[in-house]
Amino acid sequence: MCDDDETTALVCDNGSGLVKAGFAGDDAPRAVFPSIVGRPRHQGVMVGMGQKDSYVGDEAQSKRGILTLKYPIEHGIITNWDDMEKIWHHTFYNELRVAPEEHPTLLTEAPLNPKANREKMTQIMFETFNVPAMYVAIQAVLSLYASGRTTGIVLDSGDGVTHNVPIYEGYALPHAIMRLDLAGRDLTDYLMKILTERGYSFVTTAEREIVRDIKEKLCYVALDFENEMATAASSSSLEKSYELPDGQVITIGNERFRCPETLFQPSFIGMESAGIHETAYNSIMKCDIDIRKDLYANNVLSGGTTMYPGIADRMQKEITALAPSTMKIKIIAPPERKYSVWIGGSILASLSTFQQMWISKQEYDEAGPSIVHRKCF
């Protein structure tokens, strides 16, 4: 598939935290970079340094010390279209090195997003990048494809949004979708806050990236939160150290599991919402009684925020406590779940049966951006 023939479709999973992009038919994305646009916060004095007024992705990340970093996608919704266009431009021309006008493009979106978001995406793809065809798929549905199932309930949690999507025989059940605007970025913010209690101050947008790294390397989900807190209080067995970029070493203890515990107890950050185990259960209970058994047996985790060690065991324990006692409950945590949305997109876009699903440039010209609601689930 990779002789990059004229027609290979592009798959671009625009997450709130990471952009995953590549070619349909590949088994992993070619480009994975942060969804960041950085602008200098200082005056340039060196002439001929080729300083730019904005940096995207990894380059912004590496120069973060002198930049103000902004994420154009918040809670799965694109809030800054000019920056988003920069990110897409960077994806096509610098990362994948393709001409978008030659490739059909599959984009992804969180469920229950505002309709306008999807229309504007469609408009930019056709009018700015002149793609020949495009499609917008729901992220959780793609994750289920990637796990090789057609029935299951997906818990997809990324950097910006967490949602439970029950899918039966390939149909998402929109009335039972639960969306929780609590995800990786909120956990990073919370970790910044509780590290301050230890006397470590992290405030700038660049320092937030350091905390995100601490979170990804050291945090885990406790099977029993109260027990773990007691253990942490009585011994130092749970403490780990982390070296900051300037060589200073900091120690973190109970923060390691207090941070992701927020997923199960959103009240930690003042959110009046059920935890991810309850939203999963509530979502199943909103489905028809006949299909619940199949959903309980196929809880699929997807997205970077489900990568914490211990999260699958904890989900198993919590859902078992809520469900009927005889129910068989299975949590599926594929090792590649960080990219399963992208992998599902790659599978979908390379299916021969999918080829009639694309929205073509011609259809767009005739109907305008609203066609996306008719053609894409």
UniProtKB/Swiss-Prot annotation:
PTM-bearing positions, type N6-methyllysine: K86
Task of the protein: Actins are highly conserved proteins that are involved in various types of cell motility and are ubiquitously expressed in all eukaryotic cells.
Species this chain originates from: Takifugu rubripes (Japanese pufferfish)
A GO term from the CC aspect: cytoplasm
Official protein name in the record: Actin, alpha cardiac muscle
Keywords: Acetylation, ATP-binding, Cytoplasm, Cytoskeleton, Hydrolase, Methylation, Muscle protein, Nucleotide-binding, Oxidation
InterPro entries in the record: Actin (IPR004000), Actin/actin-like_CS (IPR020902), Actin_CS (IPR004001), ATPase_NBD (IPR043129)
SUPFAM superfamilies registered for this protein in UniProt: Actin-like ATPase domain
PANTHER family referenced in this protein's UniProt entry, alphabetically: ACTIN
Reaction catalysis annotation: ATP + H2O = ADP + phosphate + H(+)
One Pfam family it belongs to: Actin
EC number: 3.6.4.-
